[in-house]
């Protein structure tokens, strides 16, 4: 069943009933007169007026209802203006554009003023020089000075005085221009005497001090009316610092806002504690200035010893004076400890950051090296797969090259060992005392061999050997004569350069003779004698040494 009151299908809106009835057009063939037309037009205008009045009443009623609910319904302009103001306040760019001040123009204006003053000074100097050049030509004339010029001169004098004071103050305040600690001690002395105001302490510490005094129940307790409120204390410290800017110039400057707040607190605390100090110092200073200082001192000691109550009062005063100093020391130590903690924390953070960054860099480099290594291996494998024969050939060439290098290194090592061995043998023979005896023995052995070979050789070779023997005998005679002349000098490493040169020449000659003998003598002749064998080895070493000494250049040793 269909639910009653519910429609289904296409729902079309019903046309609203027309307020004004539709007037039928008069027919063309009707008998309507002009009077009927007038009546219809009047009725239509009346109906329209009535509809307008009804709509006006309705709108007035609605306006009254809306105003009763909210009085600011129709204040469009004011609400829009407020919205625009809020937008402008929330937008910092617009605020910066409005309140923006010139950045550089004031500095430029100052520079212009300074240049003007310098120009005026230059002109005055120029006029002064011209007057000096005139040499009193116009001294009898009257000099007229205007009031404006007098005013300018006065302003210039005042400005010069200001500059001089500013320079002196800067020199006093500048730490780099201080020659000694006289300024620091001067401030301390003035503060102790009372000529300068001591920097005030903080209100918080003053309040804690008042609480401690209340708990102890001192008789000289400060009344609530005489207590300094924090705003007045802060104002007072600001005024005092402005009046005496040099009073606290040698102390440390606070680097952060917290330290500045703590400094203000310490100043307020110091003011309260040192008021009693200044009064006490004045009390002790005044009797010293008076003529009857000794009598007053005696009177003071009598008054001091009159009653135990006054003694207790003075003790409390001393404690009260010492307490600010102790608290000030504790404040400074706390501040230093806080600074150290802050610095250590910063250092720890920076070291942790550096270590983290280093670790990250190492991991990145390691990863990059691994990637490059993997890429190289992958390329190598691809090349092997593509060109296996080429890879084998390259491997074979590399092995041959390595083997050749190893052989070359072995040869170089052997040649070096030989040279070292030759040098060692030469030094040993030069240092030994039996060097010349052994040479004589070698010469005798060689002569015996030569005689033996001469029998076998041809007559031409015999003539040559005879000539060589004569030369050898003459040289031996010369050597014996030298030995007889210098019998005390042994043949050691300290022999003269001439003797060394002679020995090298003999070695060269012996080498030449050996070559000649080898040409003549049969190479395959047996030598069973041990002396002949040792002499041959010695001859070989002598030949090597002769070659080394004959070289005019130094061979480069291969690495």
Curated annotation (Swiss-Prot):
Q: Where is the composition biased (Basic and acidic residues)?
A: 204-219, 251-274, 314-343, 351-488, 502-521
- Where is it found, in Gene Ontology cellular component terms? nuclear speck; nucleus; ribonucleoprotein complex
Residue numbers carrying Phosphothreonine: 276
- Residues with Phosphoserine modification: 27, 33, 249, 255-256, 458
Do you know which InterPro entries this protein is assigned to?
NRP1_C (IPR046850), Nsrp1 (IPR042816), NSRP1_N (IPR018612)
Coiled-coil regions, chain positions: 105-179, 379-428
GO MF: mRNA binding
Instruction: Specify the cross-link site (Glycyl lysine isopeptide (Lys-Gly) (interchain with G-Cter in SUMO2)).
Output: 211, 282
Residue ranges, compositional bias (Acidic residues) = 32-41
Q: Report keywords, A-Z.
A: Coiled coil, Isopeptide bond, mRNA processing, mRNA splicing, Nucleus, Phosphoprotein, RNA-binding, Ubl conjugation
Taxonomy, superkingdom: Eukaryota
Subcellular location, record wording: Nucleus; Nucleus speckle
Q: Output one GO BP term.
A: regulation of alternative mRNA splicing, via spliceosome
One Pfam family from the record:
NRP1_C
Q: Where is this region: Necessary for alternative splicing activity?
A: 107-171
- Where does it mainly reside? nucleus
Q: Write out the ranges of the annotated region (Disordered).
A: 22-57, 195-534
Q: Which family does it belong to?
A: Belongs to the NSRP1 family.
- PANTHER family per record: NUCLEAR SPECKLE SPLICING REGULATORY PROTEIN 1 (PTHR31938:SF4)
The subunit structure is: Interacts (via C-terminus) with SRSF1. Interacts (via C-terminus) with SRSF2.
- What's the stated role of this polypeptide? RNA-binding protein that mediates pre-mRNA alternative splicing regulation.
Q: What is this protein called?
A: Nuclear speckle splicing regulatory protein 1
